[in-house]
């Protein structure tokens, strides 16, 4: 079959190439270039509080910008901020001046969160139902793989500063190509599925977006999804398991690749979509429970802390504890990292997939995805801020871990109600906009369903305004 420029496959390929030139380059080289090795498995927050707050706000801002400015505009903005960020690293190497770098880092971090919302909205909307989960897993793994390689490079590298400068220049040259790819991405209302039906893309205004976003928090699905969004990142935050070495990082990142298995379970047509969703929920719950139990066992493991000196700071105490854990509980510790990777990616992947099953409307999808992204960041940030107030929290405090574990179990039970509402078509938003004067649905061979009356009402093309 000949690929059309406005087909989902071509547009997703352009999106992937844009992310390779921006997100992948930064994830691959950031720690290496700035001498910042990873220090914690909770990747839903930034250890720098102001940047974390900006990240949370950017997720919510993505709701409005994805719908008002469009996907292409967000990706163009992200491309230019990536160029600025890499340029700021060159400034650091040449002039040892960090003010410009700090400003560019904050702007680029905000742009990254905006682009992530836009990317997930598109990835959930463009593929047909038989490829939705696998497309989502592919884009997540693209980011995971780049982050894994970047972490390995950062820890194992002993390059000179001159070599790092040359690497930065090469990365900047790659990033400079990203705006040309981003500008080639078609507007969402021009994308046509393989059944000949345009994607649902409604005109909107800022006033409408504010009103609909407020209404979103009265929607039963969003209210039921909120605990799931918050609880597991919160558990990661309060558990606080640092990376002791490169092996732990590799095991954690290998564990995150398990989403490939889950995506196959969700996409292969062996049962109804609701049944597949329930089975994936069970598998995700098992992964998360196993990870939580291993984390609790690891934190409760007996360690001789008599060697800790009163003059030591948090860094020295942490290094001492990690050395004991690696010498006495290495197998348990590595298993904890592996299942932590499995659980973290499974929670994120499954949450976004559930949202993709609720609606084919890109505007509603952006509101769900933006909220999910920000609430996850808030959960992780609150968790880590709570435990850092407790002295030696990684050895002496488990009460918050127990509470967070209980909260996460309850959130899975609540999510069960949402999954029970999944149908073979994404008819939640469409049902609210149905026009009874026209035929109900148009089925497609890929298993999706579109409401003809809605498409006739909400589809708009740029030539209509000419």
Q: Residues of each region from the PLM?
A:
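A membrane-interface helix-boundary motif in multi-pass transporters
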Residues: 72-73, 156-173, 273-279, 384-408
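Membrane-interfacial loop- and helix-cap regions that link adjacent transmembrane helices
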Residues: 8, 12, 25-32, 197-369, ...
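Conserved MFS/SLC helix-loop-helix module at the cytosolic interface between two early adjacent transmembrane helices
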Residues: 57-96
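Symmetry-related core transmembrane helices of the 12-TM Major Facilitator Superfamily/SLC fold
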Residues: 140, 165-185, 283-291, 398-418
């Amino acid at each position: 079959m000949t690929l059309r420029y406005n087909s989902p496959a071509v547009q997703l390929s352009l999106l992937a190439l844009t992310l390779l030139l921006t997100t992948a380059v930064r994830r691959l080289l950031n720690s290496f270039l700035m001498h910042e090795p990873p220090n914690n498995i909770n990747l839903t927050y930034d250890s720098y509080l102001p940047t974390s707050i900006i990240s949370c706000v950017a997720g919510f801002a993505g709701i409005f910008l994805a719908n008002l400015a469009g996907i292409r505009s967000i990706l163009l903005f992200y491309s230019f901020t990536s160029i600025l960020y890499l340029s700021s690293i060159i400034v650091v190497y040449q002039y040892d001046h960090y003010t410009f770098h700090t400003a560019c880092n904050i702007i680029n971090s905000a742009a990254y969160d905006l682009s992530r919302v836009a990317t997930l909205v598109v990835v959930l909307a463009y593929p047909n139902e038989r490829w939705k989960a696998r497309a989502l897993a592919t884009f997540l793994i693209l980011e995971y793989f780049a982050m894994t390689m970047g972490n390995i490079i950062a820890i194992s590298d002993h390059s000179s500063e001159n070599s790092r400068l040359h690497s930065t220049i090469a990365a900047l040259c790659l990033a400079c190509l990203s705006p040309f790819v981003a500008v080639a991405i078609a507007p969402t209302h021009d994308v046509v599925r393989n059944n000949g039906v345009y994607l649902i893309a409604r005109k909107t205004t800022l006033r409408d977006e504010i009103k609909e976003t407020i209404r979103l928090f009265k929607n039963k699905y969003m209210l039921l999804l909120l605990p799931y969004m918050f609880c597991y990142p919160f558990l990661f935050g309060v558990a606080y398991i640092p990376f002791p070495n490169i092996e732990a990082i590799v095991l954690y990142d290998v564990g995150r690749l398990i989403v490939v298995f889950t995506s196959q379970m969700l996409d292969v047509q062996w049962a109804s979509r609701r049944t597949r969703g329930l089975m994936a929920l069970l598998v995700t719950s098992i992964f998360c429970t196993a990870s939580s139990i291993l984390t609790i066992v690891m934190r409760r493991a007996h360690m001789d802390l008599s060697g800790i000196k009163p003059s030591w700071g948090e860094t020295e105490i942490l290094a001492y504890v990690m050395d004991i854990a690696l010498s006495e509980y290495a197998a348990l510790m590595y298993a904890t990292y592996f299942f932590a990777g499995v659980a973290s990616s499974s929670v994120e992947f499954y949450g976004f997939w559930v949202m993709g099953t609720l609606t084919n409307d890109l505007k509603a999808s952006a509101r769900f995805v933006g909220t999910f992204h920000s609430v996850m960041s808030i959960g992780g940030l609150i968790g880590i801020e709570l435990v850092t107030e407790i002295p030696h929290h990684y050895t002496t405090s488990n009460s918050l871990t127990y509470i967070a574990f209980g909260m996460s179990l309850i959130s899975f039970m609540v999510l069960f109600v949402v999954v029970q509402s999944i149908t073979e078509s994404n008819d939640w938003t469409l049902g609210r906009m149905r026009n009874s004067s026209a035929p109900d649905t148009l089925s497609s061979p890929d298993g999706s369903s579109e409401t003809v009356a809605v498409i006739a009402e909400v589809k708009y093309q740029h030539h209509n305004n000419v």
